[in-house]
């Protein structure tokens, strides 16, 4: 049984799972964190770094040599500095969180004169290569002050793929096979058949060439090509006896001869009969070695080599010629004794390469190279060198072509080699053997006689011949995951390659002018490439920070889109579909609805990537029907060979599979197998789904479409004021909250020393304290009321009290949407399924007023409003409270600097920051001149451009930040904010130091009390040190004590050193912080000052807000009804929410009904415990009742709770926390059964049907029949009516058409579209229609006139010409058609 930690003892979930969990839920952000850690390799020494990430990129580009080869720049190592600002400061200042990268390079200059390349001089130096973004602990990046996530990409793995066109290319429907070699970077190489069965190649999808041109360019001639691809039949030509064939009986199978096939006198096959496998066996048994054949059997066969007259050297026939009767006569005449022909047939030995050679115009290697050059560079005149270099650079140089380790592994496996290692370029023995450079010699020496290109063509012809199968590109063995680290590495390499070009140019100067490495390298291209990737790549996304779950799922997302991936428009149905290999790797449920469906997926709970980037999933080993606890991770490729049982396969107490036939999966099919043939078994029932889907209880009872919506909508839940744990969960809520990073978890065990709303101080256990200056105190600062990316509120609340004993990993503080360390997205509401006066028609939701009253769904949203003072052409803008033509009342919330006070309650239209902008001198009217002369008005040369609260928003100002450009004097408010911040930091540091100091003294006291002293203040030699004596001493005098015991003396010395070290450290840290607070801010060009105001907006639930359960049962609130009108139960308790029962059957999400039943039981059990506590029943009675709840099930693997671990006090505390309901967990696919739900209802003294009689709140009459009632975890989604509703009076118009803009952001109007016009036409409402199309839209004069008329009290309108009609006329004129209106 498990032992429970301090946090877990507070509230225990009753778990209905039958499967013992073999694996704990892994760290959910591992894919992000591990990938980036491997990229940086920050904590690894330079010499021990693996060939990954930054190190690999730097190694691949360096050394850079000059064109002459006399100077080289070599890479030694790199190190990352410390970030200038920490995460919090970066968020506040809008900076990027990163560290400077410093690379050590060595410049080597060789002596020109010496022949042996003697070194003239060497210079080593550190070079700054820009800022590298750092990942926060939660797997995000802070770019320009906002948190972003780099989503992993699922792309086609490099390697070789074989495919066919599914008969779509040619009208006959013939399958045309093709092969494609895809490198990690470099040119693609395709091979394809055409309808006439000739084989072609394409490079980078350009014009196709016969494949023999490529082989000829590699150095093969016709004979060699034919010898590679065909087996050869040898015929002996005797001048007298006709022709003899060297017989290989197998090759005759399927042929029909026009002569009898005989062994001696015995005829085996008669003429005209087809030769079968039986005949072949007879021939083999008879041992016939040669076969006399008539001449016409040889005619028409294809020669495998050139035939030459031995005496004269005359060429009689070329290889690949068909033998004619004339040639056969010539062979006899010339005394040719044997010829070889290609063994081909129509069935399984096609003459493909032979056909191809016939259409190949080239004869020599050079011609072939030139032909390839012409195809790649049309229009450029080819030279021999250019053609050779181009061809070599395409596939055979390490700079331009890289298959990568993954590509090489996939390539070798696909062409059937055992070895998975090899070169990252395409290798061809013959090609490299003919070259003379060092690299080629090394390659030839290291490798056997292989040719990558030839082997691919061989496999392709085998597939065309009917042996072998094409690949499935949607198989997860052919798609791999590219995570953050790998993408960052690629981008970094691109930046380095740009630098390399520039360095090469400058290196030649370095030889003569003695430049240093720093002067050679310009870091800008690297920094720019990285900045561009993290700031604006398609896969660098603004983090979804609605709630902890949405953060976790965003980081676990896998996208097929992005650079080097698919595009939405081109992605077909197959790519988006669920594939058998998704099982346990990618969630089969969670994917967006809409155009991205199936292209964006989520990792399954236990999935991880292997060293090659393929997804793998864990399985338990099964040996001879016995299931072991050994776990092995298999990728989709490895899984193909094994039979795998489901997680819920029945086992006995000894872990033996009990069924005669076990349901299994094998090669993507489901089948039944005896236990002895099973190799593996699933680890957990929730293995197939993602985190979001695994949070849906009773998922197994929901239709997949609704489960998808349920999983997706949980991510949109807004954190409520007080989070409530779900009464019915699935047991992984704690893991999600833990890994999301929104809670505060103890880094080390200890005792809570001090606590307030913003800070928790832990005195660490002796055993966990490190050496050196570690004082054994951990201080956790909590996040208070900050804004998330989605404008929701992030706030942490402490959960512990002073004196609590905690262990490592315990939850010390809850964040948004967490409740005692468990994910809590919504509220547990009492729900009744019944219609109520049509208010729940079509998925509408009826709410009780009590829900609003108790603030169950009240959420806090934090809006950030920014006011920027710029330097304009007419002079600087100014932030001040002195604004022209504005009443005193409008300014009463501003201080003298013109900035709103903290705590002010503001409404739409209120001024928050006063700002004036200079305007050009306008011509004054005589009246204005007179007024100016009398009153001396000066303020008219500025206009009011203050920051006002936008329409539809009201709230309380909770924070103001003022940023001032360097070199500009700070205003009073800025100075005040600065002083407050310095005070806060000083107090924080002082407190921290005081706590540390106290901890050190307390430890010292325990180490010296009772020990004998050799002297000290008022202490004689030989006296013992007592507590009373120490209390009477000043703390600083403790260090004067001289102890007899060496350990005690050491302790005093160590304590003194520790205190001094900490004092120094705190002073340095404070000075650093103070410097950062007081320094000017780095603002955008032209910006003098920036003020940010944060508003807290309280949003109560109201009609129009969208709500949902966890089963895809979404709806919109239609009405809020007084409590007394809601249906109520016999106990007098009224329900909170009334849902429409018709929303269930057609949607097939029955999970919600089961959840409601179990939730009612959970709540009922809580009430029962409450009654026990109120009656002050004996603890033993409570213990027995809890035991009844938790341990009623006697199944082998049932999850039990050992209540004997709880002291009476802990048990009472547990009971108090269960009053609100006993939380239950029904894991996905392993949940509570109907019988168990009934048993829980029975324990709670509730009807087993889960239904009860309800009474109408308005009349008091009972309803006709009983109603399903119970508790469901219901969420409020971030689609609030306040954010969507808006109204336009007059506002901006489109520039060209002069029609009103659309949308809330533009303060736009409602479009009166085509169909609405038809409706008015149908009614014959001509005047209304005219008004809609003219003065209310784009008749400029008309609408201005209308305004004047309304002001003057004349209610009439004159419709003129709509502006859009003028636009139409002008467009027609632009087509040179003169069109004008007759007056």
From Swiss-Prot:
UniProt superkingdom: Bacteria
MF (Gene Ontology): DNA binding; DNA-directed RNA polymerase activity; ribonucleoside binding
Enzyme class: transferase
Pfam families xrefs: RNA_pol_Rpb2_1, RNA_pol_Rpb2_2, RNA_pol_Rpb2_3, RNA_pol_Rpb2_45, RNA_pol_Rpb2_6, RNA_pol_Rpb2_7
Classification via PROSITE patterns: RNA_POL_BETA
GO CC, alphabetical: DNA-directed RNA polymerase complex
EC number(s) stated in the UniProt entry for this protein: 2.7.7.6
Keywords: DNA-directed RNA polymerase, Nucleotidyltransferase, Transcription, Transferase
UniProt cross-references to InterPro entries, sorted A to Z: DNA-dir_RNA_pol_bsu_ext_1_sf, DNA-dir_RNA_pol_bsu_external_1, DNA-dir_RNA_pol_su2, DNA-dir_RNAP_su2_dom, DNA-dir_RNAP_su2_hyb_sf, RNA_pol_bsu_bac, RNA_pol_bsu_CS, RNA_pol_bsu_protrusion
The keyword Amino-acid biosynthesis belongs to this UniProt entry's keyword annotation: no
Reactions performed catalytically: RNA(n) + a ribonucleoside 5'-triphosphate = RNA(n+1) + diphosphate
Biological process according to GO: DNA-templated transcription
PANTHER family listed in its UniProt record: DNA-DIRECTED RNA POLYMERASE I SUBUNIT 2
Quaternary assembly: The RNAP catalytic core consists of 2 alpha, 1 beta, 1 beta' and 1 omega subunit. When a sigma factor is associated with the core the holoenzyme is formed, which can initiate transcription.
UniProt function note: DNA-dependent RNA polymerase catalyzes the transcription of DNA into RNA using the four ribonucleoside triphosphates as substrates.
Family: Belongs to the RNA polymerase beta chain family.
The name this protein goes by in its record: DNA-directed RNA polymerase subunit beta
Organism the protein comes from: Xanthomonas oryzae pv. oryzae (strain PXO99A)
């Amino acid at each position: 049984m498990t032992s429970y930690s301090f946090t877990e003892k507070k509230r225990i979930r009753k778990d209905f799972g039958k499967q013992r969990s073999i694996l704990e839920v892994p760290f959910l952000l591992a894919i992000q964190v591990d990938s980036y850690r491997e990229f940086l390799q920050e904590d690894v020494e330079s010499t021990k770094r693996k060939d990954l990430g930054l190190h690999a990129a730097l190694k691949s580009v360096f050394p850079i040599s000059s064109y002459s080869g006399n100077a080289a720049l070599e890479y030694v190592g790199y190190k990352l500095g410390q970030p200038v600002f920490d995460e919090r400061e970066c968020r506040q200042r809008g900076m990027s969180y990163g560290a400077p990268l410093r690379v050590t390079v060595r410049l080597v200059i060789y002596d020109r004169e010496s022949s042996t390349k003697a070194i003239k001089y060497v210079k080593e130096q550190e070079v700054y290569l820009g800022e590298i973004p750092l990942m926060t602990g939660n797997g995000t990046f802070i770019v320009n002050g906002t948190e972003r996530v780099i989503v992993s990409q699922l792309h086609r793995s490099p390697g070789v793929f074989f495919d066919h066109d599914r008969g779509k290319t040619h009208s006959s429907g013939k399958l045309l096979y093709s092969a494609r070699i895809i490198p990690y970077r470099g040119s693609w190489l395709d091979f394809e058949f055409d309808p006439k069965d000739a084989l072609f190649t394409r490079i980078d999808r350009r014009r196709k060439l016969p494949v023999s041109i490529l082989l000829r360019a590699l150095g093969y001639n016709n004979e060699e090509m034919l010898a590679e691809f065909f087996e050869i039949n040898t015929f002996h030509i005797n001048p007298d006896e006709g022709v003899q064939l060297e017989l290989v009986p197998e090759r005759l199978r399927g042929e029909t001869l026009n002569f009898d096939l005989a062994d001696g006198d015995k005829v085996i096959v008669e003429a005209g009969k087809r030769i079968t496998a039986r005949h072949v066996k007879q021939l083999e048994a008879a041992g016939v070695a040669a076969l006399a054949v008539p001449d016409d059997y040889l005619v028409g066969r294809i020669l495998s080599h050139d035939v030459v007259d031995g005496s004269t050297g005359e060429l009689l026939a070329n290889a690949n010629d068909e033998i004619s009767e004339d040639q056969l006569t010539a062979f006899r005449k010339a005394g040719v004794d044997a010829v070889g022909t290609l063994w081909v047939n129509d069935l399984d030995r096609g003459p493909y390469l032979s056909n191809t050679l016939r259409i190949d115009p080239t004869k020599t290697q050079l011609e072939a190279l030139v032909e390839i050059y012409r195809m790649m560079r049309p229009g450029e005149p080819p030279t021999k060198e250019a053609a050779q270099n181009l061809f070599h650079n395409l596939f055979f140089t390490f700079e331009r072509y890289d298959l990568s380790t993954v590509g090489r592994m996939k390539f070798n496996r696909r062409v059937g080699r055992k070895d998975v290692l090899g070169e990252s370029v395409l290798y061809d023995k013959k090609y490299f053997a003919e070259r003379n450079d060092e690299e080629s010699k090394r390659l030839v020496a290291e490798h056997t006689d292989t040719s990558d290109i030839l082997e691919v063509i061989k496999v392709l012809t085998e597939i065309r011949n009917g042996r072998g199968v094409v690949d499935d590109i949607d198989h997860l063995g052919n798609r791999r995951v590219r995570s953050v680290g790998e993408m960052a590495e690629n981008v970094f390499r691109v930046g380095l390659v740009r630098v390399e070009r520039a360095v090469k140019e400058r290196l030649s100067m370095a030889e003569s002018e003695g430049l240093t490495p720093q002067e050679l390298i310009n870091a800008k291209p690297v920094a720019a490439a990285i900045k561009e990737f993290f700031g604006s790549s398609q896969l660098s996304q603004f983090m979804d920070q609605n709630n902890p779950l949405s953060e976790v799922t965003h980081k676990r997302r896998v996208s097929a889109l992005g650079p080097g991936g698919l595009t939405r428009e081109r992605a077909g149905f197959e790519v988006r579909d669920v594939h058998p290999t998704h099982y346990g790797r990618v969630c089969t449920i969670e994917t967006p609805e809409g155009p991205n469906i199936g292209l964006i997926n989520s990792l399954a709970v236990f999935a991880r990537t292997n060293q090659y980037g393929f997804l793998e999933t864990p399985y338990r080993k099964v040996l001879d029907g016995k299931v072991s606890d050994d776990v092995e991770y298999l990728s989709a490729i490895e899984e193909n060979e094994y039979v795998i049982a489901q997680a819920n396969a029945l086992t006995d107490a000894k872990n033996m599979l009990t069924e005669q036939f076990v349901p299994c999966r094998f090669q993507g099919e489901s089948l039944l197998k005896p236990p002895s043939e099973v190799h593996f078994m699933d680890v957990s029932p929730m293995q197939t789904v993602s985190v979001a889907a695994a949070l849906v209880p009773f998922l197994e009872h929901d239709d997949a479409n609704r489960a998808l919506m349920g999983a997706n909508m949980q991510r949109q839940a807004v954190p409520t004021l007080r989070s409530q744990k779900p009464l019915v969960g699935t047991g992984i809520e704690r893991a999600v909250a833990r890994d999301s990073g929104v809670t505060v978890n103890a880094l080390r065990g200890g005792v809570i020393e001090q606590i307030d709303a913003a800070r928790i101080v832990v005195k660490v256990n002796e055993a966990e304290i490190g050496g050196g200056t570690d004082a054994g105190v951990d201080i956790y600062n909590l996040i208070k009321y900050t804004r998330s990316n989605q404008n929701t509120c992030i706030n942490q609340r402490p959960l512990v009290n002073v004196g609590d004993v905690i262990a490592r990993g315990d939850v010390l503080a809850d964040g948004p949407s967490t409740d005692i360390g468990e994910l809590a997205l919504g509220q547990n509401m009492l729900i009744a399924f019944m219609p109520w006066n049509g208010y729940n028609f079509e998925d509408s939701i009826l709410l009780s007023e009590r829900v609003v009253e108790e603030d169950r769904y009240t959420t806090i949203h934090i809006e950030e409003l920014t006011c920027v003072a710029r330097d304009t052409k007419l002079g600087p803008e100014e932030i001040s409270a002195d604004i022209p033509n504005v009443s005193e009342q409008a300014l009463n919330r501003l201080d003298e600097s013109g900035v709103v006070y903290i705590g002010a309650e503001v409404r739409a239209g209120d001024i928050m920051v006063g700002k004036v902008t200079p305007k050009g001198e306008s011509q004054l009217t005589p009246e204005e001149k007179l007024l100016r002369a009398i009153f001396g008005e000066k303020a008219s040369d500025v206009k009011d451009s203050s920051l006002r609260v936008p329409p539809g928003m009201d709230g309380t100002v909770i924070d103001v930040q003022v940023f001032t450009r360097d070199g500009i004097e700070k205003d009073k408010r800025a100075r005040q904010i600065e002083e407050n911040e310095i005070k806060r930091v000083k107090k924080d540091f002082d407190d921290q130091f005081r706590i540390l100091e106290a901890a050190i003294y307390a430890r010292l006291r325990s180490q010296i009390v009772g020990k004998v002293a050799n002297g000290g203040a008022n202490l004689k030699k030989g006296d013992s040190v007592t507590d009373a004596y120490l209390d009477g001493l000043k703390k600083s005098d403790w260090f004067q004590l001289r102890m007899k015991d060496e350990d005690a003396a050491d302790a005093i010395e160590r304590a003194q050193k520790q205190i001094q070290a900490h004092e120094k450290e705190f002073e340095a840290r404070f000075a650093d912080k103070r410097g950062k607070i007081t320094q000017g801010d780095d603002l955008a060009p032209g910006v003098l000052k920036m003020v940010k105001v944060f508003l807290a907006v309280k949003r109560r639930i109201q009609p129009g807000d969208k709500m949902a359960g966890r089963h895809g049962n979404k709806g919109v609130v239609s009405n809020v009804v007084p409590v007394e009108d809601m249906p109520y139960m016999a106990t007098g308790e009224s329900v909170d929410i009334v849902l429409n029962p018709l929303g269930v059957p057609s949607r097939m999400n029955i999970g919600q009904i089961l959840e409601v039943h179990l939730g009612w039981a959970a709540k009922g059990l809580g009430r029962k415990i409450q009654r026990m506590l109120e009656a002050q029943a004996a603890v033993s009675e409570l213990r027995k009742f809890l035991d009844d709840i938790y341990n009623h099930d006697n199944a082998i693997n049932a999850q039990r709770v050992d209540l004997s671990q709880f002291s009476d006090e802990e048990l009472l505390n547990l009971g108090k926390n269960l009053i609100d309901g006993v939380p239950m967990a029904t894991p996905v696919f392993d949940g509570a059964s109907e019988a168990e739900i009934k048993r829980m209802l029975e324990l709670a003294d509730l009807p087993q049907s889960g239904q009860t009689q309800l009474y109408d709140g308005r009349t008091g009459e009972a309803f006709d029949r009983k109603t399903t009632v119970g508790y469901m975890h219901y969420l409020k989604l971030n689609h609030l009516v306040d954010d969507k509703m808006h109204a336009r009076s007059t506002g901006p118009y489109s520039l060209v058409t002069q029609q009103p803009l659309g949308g809330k952001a533009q303060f736009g109007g409602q479009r009166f579209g085509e169909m609405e016009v038809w409706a008015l036409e149908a009614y014959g409402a001509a005047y209304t229609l005219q008004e809609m199309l003219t003065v209310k839209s784009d008749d400029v004069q008309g609408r201005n006139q209308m305004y004047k008329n309304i002001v003057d009290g004349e209610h009439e309108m004159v419709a003129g010409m709509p502006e859009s009609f003028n636009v139409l006329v002008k467009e027609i004129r632009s087509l040179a058609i003169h069109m004008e209106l007759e007056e």
